[in-house]
């Protein structure tokens, strides 16, 4: 019985197969012998073998990192001029502590006779200033790197700053109006001053936080926040409804109890 098998490949395809079978990679050279009987053996030059046997990294150096020119310049300046680098850190720390000290002095000086003023001034001088000095002086490189990354990130998001500046004053005006209503309702001058001080402090901190959040992610403090709260409430309602309408397994299979 004759075999009537006819190949579907064209002569050009067969010629290409012959070329690729006997083709030698000039960069890799001849392929070494491959023993398929060995367990875990993979063909040479295989992508799977490269993934299974990665090139070991030098434990002393670790993975290669991309060199940052700013870090290199800072380290070079630190190594070449250690005294100047030390004085620079000391000067920045003293300036920051001086600004905090004089700000506390100006704000607390009218209340120096009261107990609140004495406590606030002593806490500022005894706790805040030393902590600030230690943080700036000993962690100089850490916070400078963090500030540099933050400035670069804000420069990338500069288009969002206009809407952020619009939202922050609106929030401050609403808060200030509420503070005036509360002060006039209480009527006491002392409570009115406390409400004003707390409102302005909260307004300053909230404005900074809103500016940062809105610059990084537009709408995170307004529209997106409302949507997230609404989605969370819907999810809780669905969970509550499903828990009330769920049928226990015993009622579904009464035969199992018997």
Swiss-Prot record:
Spans through the membrane: 84-106, 121-140, 196-216
Keywords recorded for this protein, A-Z: Membrane, Transmembrane, Transmembrane helix, Vacuole
Domain of life, per lineage: Eukaryota
GO (cellular component) term, any one: vacuolar membrane
InterPro entries, alphabetized: WTF
Basic and acidic residues composition bias: residue spans: 19-30
Region described as Disordered: spans on this chain: 1-71
GO biological process: meiotic drive
Pfam families: WTF
Keyword Cell inner membrane part of the UniProt annotation: no
Compartment annotation: Spore membrane; Vacuole membrane
Assembly and oligomerization: Homomer. Interacts with other proteins that exhibit high sequence similarity.
Protein family per UniProt: Belongs to the WTF family.
Name this protein carries in UniProt: Meiotic drive suppressor wtf20
Annotated source species: Schizosaccharomyces pombe (strain 972 / ATCC 24843)
Lineage of the species this protein comes from: Eukaryota, Fungi, Dikarya, Ascomycota, Taphrinomycotina
């Amino acid at each position: 019985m004759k075999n009537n098998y006819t190949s579907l490949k064209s002569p050009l395809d067969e010629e290409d197969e012959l070329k690729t079978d006997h083709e030698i990679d000039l960069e890799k050279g001849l392929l070494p012998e491959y023993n398929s009987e060995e367990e875990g053996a993979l063909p040479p030059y295989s992508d799977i073998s490269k993934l299974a046997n990665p090139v070991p990294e030098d434990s002393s150096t670790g993975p290669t990192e991309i060199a940052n020119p700013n870090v290199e310049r800072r380290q070079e300046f630190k190594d070449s001029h250690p005294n100047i680098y030390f004085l620079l850190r000391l000067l920045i720390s003293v300036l920051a502590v001086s600004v905090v000290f004089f700000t506390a002095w100006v704000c607390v000086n009218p209340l120096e006779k009261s107990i609140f003023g004495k406590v606030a001034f002593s806490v500022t001088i005894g706790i805040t200033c030393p902590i600030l000095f230690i943080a700036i002086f000993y962690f100089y490189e850490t916070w400078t790197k963090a500030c540099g990354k933050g400035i670069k990130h804000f420069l990338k998001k500069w288009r969002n700053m206009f809407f952020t500046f619009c939202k922050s004053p609106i929030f401050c005006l609403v808060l200030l109006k509420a503070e005036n209503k509360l002060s006039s309702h209480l009527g006491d001058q002392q409570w009115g001053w406390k409400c004003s001080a707390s409102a302005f402090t909260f307004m300053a901190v909230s404005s900074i936080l809103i500016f940062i959040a809105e610059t990084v992610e537009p709408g995170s403090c307004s529209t997106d926040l409302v949507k997230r709260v609404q989605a969370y409430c819907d999810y809780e309602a669905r969970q509550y409804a499903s828990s009330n309408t769920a049928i226990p397994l015993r009622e579904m299979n009464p035969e199992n109890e018997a």
